[in-house]
Each structure stands twice: as structure tokens, then as C-alpha cells.
Amino acid sequence: MESITSIEMYVADRNAEWLGVPRLVLMENAGAAVARNVLRKFPTAKRILVVCGTGDNGGDGYVAARHLHAAGRTVRVIALGEPREELARINYQAVTRLWGVEVKAAQLPLELLALQDWFMWAEVIVDAVLGTGIRGVLREPHATAIELMNISPAPKVAVDVPSGLDPDTGEVRDKAVRAALTVTFHKAKRGLLAPGAQRYVGELVVEPIGIPPEAELVVGPGDFAYLNFTRRADSKKGDHGRVLVIGGSLEYSGAPVYVALAALRAGVDLAVIAAPEPAAYAAKAISPDIIAIPLEGPRLSTKHVDKLASLAERFNVVAMGPGLGVEEETQEAVRELFRRLAGKRAMVIDADALKALRGVRASGAVVYTPHAGEFKALTGAEPPQSLSERMAVVREQAAALGGVILLKGRYDVISDGVRVKVNMTGTPAMTVGGTGDVLTGLVAAFLTKTSDPLEAAAVAAFVNGLAGEDAAAELGFHITASDLIERLPRVIRRYAFESIR
């Protein structure tokens, strides 16, 4: 049986909406599925109690109550507080307008105990209290609600996950509803299949609710949930990411600047460029926000490796490649530095550095960001035109390299050798030079906010494309990489903080 973690389910739910399937429709389908299974398993039961929490699980319960009432059952609902989610609130209001459904609020344990006769009255109890929303030790009124449900002789039907059961591990830290039937949605939550969970789960039914398979494949707003954008009140400089950019040469000084500025706009505290002298001095002149450390000479060479390896110890992430050039001494320096840092620092490899690392296997968190030509230089493989074939090739080559590949294109394809994601944001206006450097800076920044390099790369591609779309909507096709950088904070703010739950 296919399974999914709670965060993967959250992501799929949000991304389904991004693809055009409203979450209100998903909630309606979920609640209707619960009601349908209650009627199937307990066809003679007439009196049904639905206990609803304050989140989306409670919203599913309100929908189920409405459908059970429509099927001719006598339904009572206990609301454990005002719904805190808008969709749950809509369905709460809908069920309270039904004359035939009795709804009572019970936010305190004493208020629940006063309704103990309702628990004994029921022939079936629907548990819509927590679902996948459990976090740590049970709080009130949830603990009392679970206890009263378990005391009742009526069989329990759990909505998505029995309340109190960890959806990812199947562990029960305190107490959990002992269900005769669990109706879960889209895919089985991993904890439902864990050894020892069966006595709480009972019969397990997986119901489709309209989430398309693309919701798990396509990058969307839900993927922000993998990144941590929160900040403690007592945060200090450096707590939120330090990125070292190794790039630039006599001929190319702008590329590392784009990387560093994008990383700063994506929320890192410190972005430092280590570049050959001409590029370092140019970077200092371009922006006062950037610290630039000059490396002796016109281009990177092996004589700089010791200094750079030592410098990298002060940073979370190293981004290497933009503007370095392809001279043999530079390519050799890239290979040596890559080997020195492998497994010790997260790395983003882009542009000229990609050409130096063909056949060099990665260890640790490494993200490669090639376009089609660089992909061939890195792997020896030609990326196919067909999206499905391209996905297969990127996954195969990522597995061979031991890192994450973000293959840029009309649709960006991202894989760690096992999982594959596709980013659909972007615009033809982004063919202008420098947008790939902005992407490198975003990947570097997001590697400081998650331990999952695939998701760091996926969200970076998503944000980069949205920034390009925003710039093109305002300016047409005549945009620059600087226009993207300017819009990054607004794009990130639009989606990041909805994911903090």
C-alpha cells in the first residue's frame, strides 16, 4: 500500500489548489467519503455523534455530519472550539444552519464532561478532532474528548488518522482513539501502517478525494513547508544563513554579484564573494551589501584552494562556478576544492564549475544547476525533449552523481536520483543573462533553511520563475536579472509564511 508523510500530504493538498483544485472541494470530498464509509460499515446505526476539532480535520467532520444528516441519520456535533481555518469555518457555519443537526460547543473539559450522555447516546462516533494535526503531548480539550470517545461502547470512525496517533510514526505518546474504522485520504499516512498501530486504526480505507498526481510532482506553494523561514526574537547575525560565493574572473565580474544579492534577498544574513582581484573589486563597487574577498591574480587557480577551504568553514553553504571561466588551472582548482569540501559543506555547483566535475561523484548536500548544454558537459548525456524522458534521464544522472540535479529549461526538472519534481513557473523573458545566477543564489539561500537539498532546489526554481513572471508582467520581455532580485522578497513573502504551521 502506498504511503505518505503528513508534510507530504500537506504539500500535495496545497499544490492541488495551485493546480486549480480548490481545497474546499477536497474537504467536501473527504467529508463525503467519511459519511459514505460510515453508512457502509454501520448501515443500521441511526444515532451518530461527530466530534470536531478546530482545524481542517474538524472541517472534514462537519462535512461528514451534513452528509449523514442528508442520509436520514440523527446527527449530533460537538465542536471543540471555534474553527481556526477558513474552510473549516465555512463548513461549521453550514452545519449549524441545519435544523435537524444539534451542535454544541465544548472548549473546556468540564463542558465535555457535561455532554457525556451524548457519547453514550451515540451508536457511532466520528473522530474528527486532530487527524494529522497532532503536535507533541495532547492538550485539552483533546485529551478529554479522546477519553470520552474511548469510554463509549459505540464504534469509532477516525477521520484520516485516529486522534492521538502520530501520523508519521504510529506512536501514541499519551492516549489515542481506538477506531473500528479509519478513513484516510489520498494515500495511507505512514503511521497508520506502523507495527502496533493496528489496534487504534481498525479497518483502514483509503479514499481518493480529487488530488491529482501532479500535486506531488509539480512544485507549488505547498513545498515552502519544507523550508524554515521562522526567526527567533533573540536571533543574531549569522543565525539565518551564511553563503560563500566562489566565482568571477577578469572577464566576468557580474555573475557572482547576482548570486550573492539573490541569496541576501532570499533571507540569508551574510553573503560573501571570494573572487579573483578584478572581479572582487568590481563587486565591491556594485553593491555595499556585499563583502568581497580578493584572490590574487586574474582568475581562480590551485594556489587559492587552501585559503578557500579554510574560509568555507565559516559558512553553511558554498556556491561555486558563476563567472569563473574554463581555463585548465581554474578547472583543476574547482575539482580540488570540490573534493576538499565534499560532505563538509552544502554546495551549489553552477556554470563553469559544472564543466570541471564530469565523473566526480558528490557526497553530502550538493545541488547542480545546469542548462541543457552544461548538463551534457557534466554527465555526458543529452537531455531529451520529451518531459517524461527528461525526468527519467535527470533522475538516472542524479543517482550516478550522488547529488541533486536541477536541469533548467521550459520546465525545470529536479531530482535527487529517487524523487523527481517539475517546476512550471517562468517566462521566455528570463532568457536574459544572469537569471541562472539568481537561481544559484536562491538555491544556496534555501539550503540554509532545510536539510532536504531537493526541496531547496525545487522551491528556488519556483521562486525564480515567479519573480521572472512578476517582472515580465510589469516590464514586458525587457527585464534584467536585477529586476528578478528586486522582486524576490515579495514573492517569498507571498508564499513562505502561509507554510509556517
UniProtKB/Swiss-Prot annotation:
In this chain, (6S)-NADPHX 2 is annotated as bound at 323, 437
Q: Which catalytic reaction applies to this protein?
A: (6S)-NADHX + ADP = AMP + phosphate + NADH + H(+); (6S)-NADPHX + ADP = AMP + phosphate + NADPH + H(+); (6R)-NADHX = (6S)-NADHX; (6R)-NADPHX = (6S)-NADPHX
Enumerate the residues binding ADP.
Answer: 408-412, 427-436
How the cofactor binds, per note? Answer: Binds 1 potassium ion per subunit.
CDD domains xref list: YXKO-related
Q: Return the annotated region ranges for ADP-dependent (S)-NAD(P)H-hydrate dehydratase.
A: 221-501
Q: Molecular function (GO) terms listed?
A: ADP-dependent NAD(P)H-hydrate dehydratase activity; ATP binding; metal ion binding; NAD(P)HX epimerase activity
The residues that the entry says bind K(+) are 57, 127, 163
Does the keyword field hold Transmembrane helix?
no
Pfam families from the entry? Carb_kinase, YjeF_N
* List of residues binding (6S)-NADPHX 1: 160
**Swiss-Prot/TrEMBL GO biological process terms:** metabolite repair; nicotinamide nucleotide metabolic process
Location of the region described as NAD(P)H-hydrate epimerase in the Swiss-Prot/TrEMBL record: 1-221
Q: What does this protein do?
A: Bifunctional enzyme that catalyzes the epimerization of the S- and R-forms of NAD(P)HX and the dehydration of the S-form of NAD(P)HX at the expense of ADP, which is converted to AMP. This allows the repair of both epimers of NAD(P)HX, a damaged form of NAD(P)H that is a result of enzymatic or heat-dependent hydration.
User: Which family does the UniProt entry place this protein in?
Assistant: In the N-terminal section; belongs to the NnrE/AIBP family.
Q: What is this protein called?
A: Bifunctional NAD(P)H-hydrate repair enzyme Nnr
Q: Which organism is it from?
A: Pyrobaculum aerophilum (strain ATCC 51768 / DSM 7523 / JCM 9630 / CIP 104966 / NBRC 100827 / IM2)
